[in-house]
Regions:
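N-terminal alpha-helical transmembrane segments of multi-pass membrane transport
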Residues: 2-78, 82, 97
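Alpha-helical membrane segments and immediately flanking helix-loop junctions
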Residues: 108-112, 120-126, 140-151, 161-191, ...
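Juxtamembrane and boundary regions of transmembrane helices in multi-pass small-molecule transporters
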Residues: 154-163, 195-229, 339-352, 397-414
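Alpha-helical transmembrane segments
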Residues: 190-208, 328-336, 359-362
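Transmembrane helical segments that form the transport core of multi-pass membrane transport proteins
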Residues: 253-340
Length: 414
């Protein structure tokens, strides 16, 4: 009956149980995956992002499944079947064959920096710059929220991260997944997994984080400032005559200006504005718009989500660096929100026309999530006080702001 025992031993080896019992840290990763799935499915927090990421985390952590992304070290060296190889010198078919599907997607589409700008094109196609152009003076608060990025950068350097790692860590404060990924690839590729997870998780947790920070920093009286009444009391002098023409000129002008001043931000801003331009031109480019906003955007999101999730293997994730990144990312996030709020408070000290501090809190680029959350807070205190359109203007300028901040970091530290 040794035959039977042999067969059972073989069957047991085939399963993942032996490895999981030998290394229970996998169980922590399953727990993280299930929490993220719960947030995405039951709580409806950014399901389009959280569900693919969480599922990526889940499938990456079954030993023997070969779906985890293998992290190359700083010099690009990885273990392939017991041999050290340089990942950048391996042909793609070899990566696919030896390291599996996820590594193929990851090294081809993400590490090369291909997907983030493509997703930005989709974001541009789905963004309406109208609210921002109508309230241009509010868009300055989108710039103020980038303070969190630079504050955390300084703190991280003091804590012993290299300037490059610190820059990648700080960009989490921009609350923008593709920007965080793009910056990290350029500055600290070995930290891509945890930084991407932190950026996307905090983006998804915007409905929890913004109210926390707002409760701490704003009085009820400030939250009840009604922007519409302020408009009536102090009407603005400038009136936009031809919004449609302006909306077409805007993406072209922004790209040109940003490209002249921060050329490293062009891959992100250029694609964002191109996506927006084909939307605003209208029927002549409607087919391009349709592709950018739907099929391309959706396919890119699937590949990005799954492979970013798959970078979260237990050995890559359960260490002090990662925990530092998760904590630092939270700080960057909270500081970005409070930076925007303080900027509004400062503005209100000197201006007759008051601004609701919630408009500072939406300087993050989690669009339109942050604006929706702030609108809910405002209507809770005063059901007639709708701030959505005003929030959108600082929210959307936050997208441009974080991409420009990324460009600045890349050119200084890269």
């Amino acid at each position: 009956d040794w035959m039977m025992e042999d067969i059972f031993a073989k069957l047991y080896d085939m399963t993942a149980f032996s490895n999981i019992i030998a290394d229970p840290s996998f169980l922590i990763m399953y727990a993280i995956a299930f929490i993220l799935l719960y947030l995405g499915i039951r709580k409806h927090y950014e399901p389009l992002l959280l569900v693919p990421i969480a599922f990526g985390v889940l499938i990456a952590n079954f030993p023997g499944g070969d779906m985890g992304v293998i992290q190359a070290d700083e010099n690009g060296m990885v273990m392939v079947n017991g041999v050290l190889k340089n990942i950048w010198e391996m042909p793609l078919h070899e990566i696919a064959h030896d390291l599996g599907l996820m590594n193929f997607i990851y090294y081809m589409l993400i590490k090369t920096g291909f997907l983030p700008p493509v997703i930005f094109m989709g974001v541009g196609a789905l963004t309406d710059f109208g609210p921002m152009l109508r309230n241009l003076r509010l868009s300055i608060f989108g710039a103020a929220a980038q303070l969190g990025i630079f504050t955390v950068l300084l703190c991280a350097v003091m804590m012993g991260f290299t300037p490059q790692e610190a820059g990648a860590l700080g960009i989490i404060g921009g609350a923008d997944g593709p920007t965080a990924i793009f910056t990290t690839i350029k500055l600290a590729p070995h930290l891509l997994g945890p930084i991407a997870i932190a950026a996307y998780s905090y983006m998804a947790l915007v409905p929890v984080i913004i109210p926390l920070v707002v409760k701490l920093l704003c009085s009820k009286k400030e939250l009840m400032i009604n922007m519409k009444e302020q408009e009536k009391l102090y009407p603005s002098k400038t009136e936009i005559k031809n919004l449609r023409v302006l909306k077409i000129i805007f993406p072209i002008a922004v790209t040109t200006i940003v490209a002249l001043f921060v050329p490293t931000a062009v891959p992100l801003i250029g694609m964002l504005m191109f996506g927006n331009l084909i939307k605003e031109i209208g029927s002549d480019t409607s087919r391009l718009f349709d592709a950018a906003a739907n099929s391309i955007m959706n396919a890119a999101t699937i590949f990005l989500g799954l492979s970013v999730g798959a970078t979260m293997t237990s050995e890559a994730f359960l260490n002090w660096t990662t925990i530092g990144i998760v904590v630092g990312g939270f700080l960057a996030f909270a500081l970005s929100i409070s930076g925007g709020i303080f900027f509004v408070k400062l503005f209100n000290l000197f201006s007759k026309k008051k601004i609701n501090p919630l408009i500072g809190a939406t300087g993050l680029s989690a669009v339109p999530m942050a604006s929706r959350v702030c609108n809910e807070i405002a209507t809770k205190y005063d059901p007639k006080n709708h701030v959505l359109n005003y929030c959108m203007s600082s929210n959307i300028s936050g997208v441009i702001g974080s991409a420009v901040a990324a460009g600045v970091l890349i050119s200084f530290l890269g």
